[in-house]
From Swiss-Prot:
Annotated Basic and acidic residues bias: 66-78, 97-119
Descriptive protein name: DNA replication licensing factor Mcm2
Residues that hold ADP according to the record: 515-516
Modification Phosphoserine, positions: 27, 89, 92, 124
Miscellaneous comment text of the record: Early fractionation of eukaryotic MCM proteins yielded a variety of dimeric, trimeric and tetrameric complexes with unclear biological significance. Specifically a MCM467 subcomplex is shown to have in vitro helicase activity which is inhibited by the MCM2 subunit. The MCM2-7 hexamer is the proposed physiological active complex.
Any one GO cellular component localisation term in the record: CMG complex
CDD domains, per database record: MCM2
InterPro entries the record matches: MCM, MCM2, MCM_CS, MCM_dom, MCM_lid, MCM_N, MCM_OB, NA-bd_OB-fold
PROSITE patterns the record matches: MCM_1 (PS00847), MCM_2 (PS50051)
Length: 887
C-alpha cells in the first residue's frame, strides 16, 4: 500500500512545465547541448509509475461521516462507575502546576523520571524545528535529573558485552561511559539498606554538611546492585573512578548548586574490596588494577602542592595558554603559542593554575605478617586531595588504590636497564586500630565474651591460657596477663600525662623459656613488634631521619617503639644493648613519646606501647647472693621504669625437675605432626581450670582494652600508703632496689588491669590486694637470698592474698622434703629411696600462715600427683625417691 503522505501523481501539464523550466535553465551559449529529456529516454515507464501510484485504497471516501453517527446501544454507561453526582471544584492553573511540581519532586527523590510536559507537547517531529536554546534547556534538565535524557543517549542493555574490545577501551567509549554514568547515578539515588534508608543520598548530604570532598561507596553494595560496574571497576580503575567522580559531582551540584565554592572536586572512595593482597605478592598481573593491601607506615613526606590544572604564559606575547589537565604519569606542555605561533619559552601562570594536595608515604609489611626468614617489603603510596595527613609513622594502614607504574630515572641509572618504579595511588585509606577489631566482633562473639567474664575463676583461666606450652612460672604468666590487659592512661587537664601501660622485665638463667614467653606474646597480642637488643640501635628502636634519594628531602622513619604504638614492643637480649642505645628509650617507656630534633625536623612521635623485655644475668647465671641490679647490667633509671621484675632461677629441685621432664616429653608426643591415635601420657599435673582458646582470648583482650575504663573509687588508700611506707623502709635497710613513687603508680595500673580482666568498670579491694601482692613478689624476688626469707615473713599477709591453701602448703612441704632429702643423702649416701616428713613440722609451719586444717590438702590432687602419701597412724608424710629423682 502506498504511503498516504506521498505527493499526488504528476499530470501532463506538470511535465510541460518541467520542460519549460529546464529550457529556461539551459545555458545560452550555443556550444553546449541542452539537457536530455528524460521522458524521451524512459518512454512510457513514467506513465506506468504514475498509474501504479494512483492504485491503492482511497481513505477519503464519501461515507466517512458515517463513522460519527450516533449509536445509542453503545452510549449506555454503568451508573456505579460514574462520579457525576459528586461535586468537585474546578482546579486552577496554579494549583495544577503546584501539584505537578510536587509530583515531580517526589519522583526525583524516588529515582523515577516522568516525561516533562514541555518535551511531550512542545517538541516537533523535525529536530530542525527545535532551536539551540530549547536544546540547551532540555539538556540542562536532563543533567540534573528532571527529565530522562532519552534522546541524547541510547541505553545499552548488555553493557557487559564489550564487543571484542578490552575493558579499558570499552569504558572509554562515549556510549558505555554514558551508560555507566546513568547506572551509577541510579545506584546512588535508589540504593537502600536493610532498614529502607537511602544509604548514599544520606552520605552525600552528611558529606556536604561537613564541607568534605569525598564519600565512601561499598564495593559489596555496588556488586549486589550493579554487578557489571563492579566487574569493570577493578579492571579499569582510572576510567571508572573518573566517571564515578563526575557523576558524584553532578549529584552534589544538583542538591547544593553552590557547593563548588567549597570544593571543585568530589571523589568516590571504594571500600570493602573482597581480596586483600600482601605487598610481596604484587606482580605484573596487578598493574593498573584496583587492589587492597595492608601495612605499617614507616615514612611520610610533607604535604606538597601538585599541579592539577595548568595554565602557561607565552613569554614572547603574554598570551595565556590552557587549561591543561595534568595526569599522574605524564607531564603536559604546550607545543606552540596559538597567538604568535612561537614554540616557547612558556612559564607557568601561578595565579590561574590549580593545585591539589600531594603526599607520599612508605608502606611496609606488618611485623606479624612477614614470612619466616624474609625481610619486610615496602611500597610507596601516593595520597592525593583529602587523603593527605590521615596517617603518621607507626600506623597500621589498610589501603585501597590503583597499583601503577611511573618512570624513575634514578632507578634506571642504578639498575643499568630500563625498569619502572611501581607505586599505589590511594583511593581509600583506613587506619586500623583496636576499634576496628571490636567492630568486627559479632553479637555472638560479644555474648561469649560477656559470659566468660562472669566466670568467678576468670583470672585463673586467663593465667592458665598464657603460654600453655610452658610448664610452671605462674608468677610470670600472671604478670604477662596484666601487661596485656594494661591499665588506664590519664592526662589531667592536658598538662601531665600518666601512662597506663605496664612494662615487664624478665631476667633469669639460660634455658628458662624467657624468649618463649616473648614469642607467645607476639602471637596473642593484637599488635606486637619483636626485636632483639643485639640487632637494635637507638634509631632502630625510636625514629630516625633520612634523605629521600629522589626528592632529596629529609623524611622521618619510625622505629620499633613507634611501630608498636598502642600495642606491645618485645625486646629480647635487652642487656646486650649499648648504654647509649638503651638510654634513648627512657622517654618512650615513661612519657610514651619520642622527640626528634634532627636535620631541621623538630617533632614528637607517639610510642604508647607496653615494653616486655628479657635479659640474661651478668656471667650467664643468676647469683642469689647479690641483688637484682648487681646481677643485671642495667642502670637504676631503666629498672625503675619497669613495673614488674620477674626473676627466673634454674634451681635444683628433684620434684619439679621430674614434673618438668614429664611435661616436656608429653608435649612433644602430643604435638608431633605424624601423631595418630595414641594412648595419651598421663598429665604431669591435673589442670584445676580450663584454658581459654587462643582466638577467644585475643578477642577478650581487645574487647576489654577498648570498652572497659576502670575507675578508682572505693579503694583502701591507707592500705597502699602503709605498704609503700613499709616497703621504702625495707628498701633502705637492705640497700636493694630503691622504691619510688613509680611503684605506687605501678600498683594502681595493675589494679586497673586486674579489674579489666573481670570486665569491671570500678576497681575493687580485691584488685588492689592482687596488685600489691604482684608488686611485693617482684620486689622480694629482686633481693639477696639472705634477706628474702625475712621479707617474705614481714609481708606474709599481703603475699598470701588469694593463694590456695594447698599451694601454700605444697610450697612448704617441698622445702621440708628437699631439706630432709639432702640430710639423708649426706648421712646414708646417694642411694636413699624414702623421705619421711613428720606431720608436726608441717603443722608448725602452716600455723604461721593461719592454716589449721590440713585434711583438704592431703586429699587434693596436688598432693597425690606429686608423689606424696600420708600415713595417719604414724602421722608422717612419705615420698619415695627412685634413682635420685622423686617418683
Amino acid at each position: 500500500m502506498d504511503n498516504p503522505s506521498s505527493p499526488p501523481p504528476n499530470t501532463p501539464s506538470d511535465a510541460a512545465e518541467r520542460r519549460d523550466l529546464r529550457a529556461a535553465m539551459t545555458s545560452p551559449v550555443g556550444d553546449f547541448e541542452p539537457f536530455e529529456n528524460e521522458d524521451e529516454i524512459l518512454g512510457d515507464q513514467t506513465v506506468r509509475d504514475e498509474a501504479e501510484e494512483e492504485d491503492g485504497e482511497e481513505l477519503f471516501g464519501d461515507n466517512m461521516e458515517n463513522d460519527y453517527r450516533p449509536m445509542p446501544e453503545l452510549d449506555h454507561y454503568d451508573p456505579a462507575l460514574l462520579d457525576d453526582e459528586d461535586d468537585f471544584s474546578e482546579m486552577s492553573q496554579g494549583d495544577r502546576f503546584a501539584a505537578e511540581s510536587e509530583m515531580r519532586r517526589r519522583d526525583r527523590a524516588a529515582g523515577i523520571h516522568r516525561d516533562d510536559r514541555d518535551l511531550g507537547f512542545g517538541q516537533s517531529d523535525d529536530e530542525d524545528d527545535v532551536g539551540p536554546r530549547a536544546k540547551r534547556r532540555a539538556g540542562e534538565k536532563a543533567a540534573v535529573g528532571e527529565v530522562e535524557d532519552t534522546e541524547m543517549v541510547e541505553s545499552i542493555e548488555n553493557l557487559e558485552d564489550t564487543k571484542g574490545h578490552s575493558t579499558k577501551e570499552w569504558v572509554s567509549m562515549l556510549g558505555p561511559r554514558t551508560e555507566i554514568a546513568n547506572r551509577f547515578q541510579s545506584f546512588l539515588r535508589t540504593f537502600v539498606d536493610e532498614r529502607g534508608a537511602y544509604t548514599y543520598r544520606d552520605r552525600i548530604r552528611r558529606m556536604c554538611e561537613q564541607n568534605m570532598s569525598s564519600f565512601v561507596v561499598s564495593y559489596t553494595d555496588l556488586a549486589n546492585k550493579e554487578h557489571v560496574l563492579a566487574y569493570f571497576l577493578p579492571e579499569a580503575p582510572f576510567q571508572m573512578l573518573e566517571i564515578f567522580d563526575k557523576v558524584a559531582k553532578d549529584m552534589v551540584l544538583s542538591i547544593f548548586p553552590t557547593y563548588e565554592r567549597v570544593t571543585t572536586e568530589i571523589h568516590v572512595r571504594i571500600s570493602e574490596l573482597p581480596l586483600i593482597e600482601e605487598l610481596r605478592t604484587f606482580r605484573k598481573l596487578h598493574l593498573n588494577q584496583l587492589v587492597r593491601t595492608l601495612g605499617v607506615v614507616t615514612a611520610t613526606t610533607g604535604v606538597l602542592p601538585q599541579l592539577s590544572v595548568i595554565k602557561y604564559d607565552c613569554v614572547k606575547c603574554g598570551y595565556v595558554l590552557g587549561p591543561f589537565v595534568q595526569s599522574q604519569n605524564t607531564e603536559i606542555k604546550p607545543g606552540s603559542c596559538p597567538e604568535c605561533q612561537s614554540t616557547g619559552p612558556f612559564s607557568i601562570n601561578m595565579e590561574q593554575t590549580l593545585y591539589r594536595n600531594y603526599q607520599k608515604i612508605t608502606l611496609q609489611e606488618s611485623p606479624g605478617r612477614i614470612p619466616a626468614g624474609r625481610i619486610p617489603r615496602s611500597k610507596d603510596v601516593i595520597l592525593l586531595a583529602d587523603l593527605c595527613d590521615q596517617c603518621k609513622p607507626g600506623d597500621e594502614l589498610e589501603v585501597t588504590g590503583i597499583y601503577t607504574n611511573n618512570y624513575d630515572g634514578s632507578l634506571n641509572t642504578d639498575q643499568g636497564f630500563p625498569v619502572f618504579a611501581t607505586v599505589i595511588i590511594a583511593n581509600h585509606v583506613v587506619v586500623k586500630d583496636s576499634k576496628q577489631v571490636v567492630q568486627s566482633l559479632t553479637d555472638e562473639d560479644i555474648a561469649t565474651i560477656q559470659k566468660l567474664s562472669k566466670d568467678p575463676r576468670i583470672v585463673e583461666r586467663v593465667v592458665a591460657s598464657m603460654a600453655p606450652s610452658i610448664y610452671g612460672h605462674d608468677y610470670i604468666k600472671r604478670a604477662l596477663a596484666l601487661a596485656l590487659f594494661g591499665g588506664e592512661s590519664k592526662n589531667p587537664g592536658e598538662k601531665h600525662k600518666v601512662r597506663g601501660d605496664i612494662n615487664l622485665l624478665i631476667c633469669g638463667d639460660p634455658g628458662t623459656a624467657k624468649s618463649q614467653f616473648l614469642k607467645y606474646t607476639e602471637k596473642v597480642a593484637p599488635r606486637a613488634v619483636f626485636t632483639t637488643g643485639q640487632g637494635a640501635s637507638a634509631v632502630g628502636l625510636t625514629a630516625y631521619v633520612r634523605r629521600n634519594p629522589v626528592s632529596r628531602e629529609w623524611t622521618l622513619e619510625a622505629g620499633a617503639l613507634v611501630l608498636a604504638d598502642q600495642g606491645v614492643c618485645l625486646i629480647d637480649e635487652f642487656d646486650k644493648m649499648n648504654d647509649q642505645d638503651r638510654t634513648s628509650i627512657h622517654e618512650a617507656m615513661e612519657q610514651q613519646s619520642i622527640s626528634i630534633s634532627k636535620a631541621g625536623i623538630v617533632t614528637s612521635l607517639q610510642a604508647r606501647c607496653t615494653v616486655i623485655a628479657a635479659a640474661n644475668p651478668i656471667g650467664g647465671r643468676y647469683d642469689p647472693s647479690m641483688t637484682f641490679s648487681e646481677n643485671v647490667n642495667l642502670s637504676e633509671p631503666i629498672l625503675s621504669r619497669f613495673d614488674v621484675l620477674c626473676v627466673v632461677k634454674d634451681e635444683f629441685d628433684p620434684m619439679q625437675d621430674q614434673q618438668l621432664a614429664k611435661f616436656v616429653v608429653h608435649s612433644h608426643m602430643k604435638h608431633h605432626p605424624s601423631e595418630e591415635e595414641q594412648p595419651e601420657l598421663e598429665e604431669p599435673q591435673l589442670k584445676t581450670v580450663d584454658e581459654i582458646p587462643q582466638d577467644l582470648l585475643r578477642q577478650y583482650i581487645v574487647y576489654a582494652k577498648e570498652n572497659i575504663r576502670p575507675k578508682l573509687t572505693n579503694i583502701d588508700e591507707d592500705k597502699i600508703a602503709k605498704m609503700y611506707a613499709q616497703l621504702r623502709q625495707e628498701s633502705f635497710a637492705t640497700g636493694s632496689l630503691p622504691i619510688t613513687v613509680r611503684h605506687i603508680e605501678s600498683v594502681i595500673r595493675m589494679s586497673e588491669a586486674h579489674a579489666r580482666m573481670h570486665l569491671r568498670e570500678n576497681v575493687m579491694e580485691a584488685d588492689v590486694s592482687m596488685a600489691i601482692r604482684m608488686m611485693l613478689e617482684s620486689f622480694i624476688e629482686a633481693q639477696k637470698f639472705s634477706v628474702m626469707k625475712k621479707m617474705r615473713s614481714t609481708f606474709q599477709k599481703y603475699l598470701s592474698f588469694q593463694k590456695d591453701h594447698s599451694e601454700l602448703l605444697f610450697f612448704i612441704l617441698r622445702q621440708l622434703t628437699l631439706d630432709q632429702l639432702a640430710y639423708i643423702r649426706c648421712k646414708d649416701g646417694p642411694g636413699a629411696t624414702h623421705v619421711e616428713i613428720m606431720e608436726r613440722d608441717l603443722i608448725e609451719r602452716a600455723k604461721q600462715l593461719d592454716i589449721v586444717n590440713l585434711k583438704p590438702f592431703y586429699e587434693s590432687d596436688l598432693f597425690r600427683t606429686n608423689g606424696f602419701s600420708y600415713d595417719p597412724k604414724r602421722r608422717i608424710i612419705l615420698q619415695i625417691v627412685v634413682d635420685g629423682n622423686t617418683a
